[in-house]
Amino acid sequence: QGAIEIASQAGDEWIASLTRLTMGASLMLASRYEAAEDWLNRAVLGFQECSDPFGRTAARLWLCYGWHKQKQVERLERTLTEVLAACRENDYGFLFTTRSHLGAPDERIFVPLLVLARDRGWEGAYALRLLESLGLGGVQSHPGFRLSVETLGSFQVRRGSEAIPSNGWRREKSRQLFQLLLTYHQSPLDRDQICEHLWPEADPATAQRNFKI
């Protein structure tokens, strides 16, 4: 807030709008959608006053992200179509495909928007092209994050930039099963082999029952 006041007093609407965009994006990522939308709408107006189509497009993209997370698909058609058109016409596609200061901290968070646009025909050909540049042209759905695994040293799984804690797994055996399948990813295991690895001391009937739970 202080940065905006200083920028406004100096007559620098662009810096003020940039700060509003950054605040709005941060609030969107924190799932504080109502507050985020207020900041972003003000950023859109500010960038419009400054004749900055890039900033305006970035702010509107974050609005689309929030509407999609809230399943307000009816609000998306016009704005997402216009955002994609602006990206196509001005080479702003990197907002969807790479990490950037005004875009995503994880480029996968906007993939669900691209899948929706492709399927609904909202700049569908361009949305498909962006998906293909990510190697995701054929996906039918996407969670909106990249899953990364660290196996050297302590085992760690990250959902986007967020590390999943040990207690974040519903069951400890789920974590162990994931590790097992990762270890033997080139050698498919059948159910009996998995049960032997996870419950070596259990009789077959008990192991089978544990596997189903």
Language-model segments: which ranges?
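TPR/TPR-like alpha-solenoid helical repeat scaffolds
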Residues: 19, 58-61, 93-117, 127-135
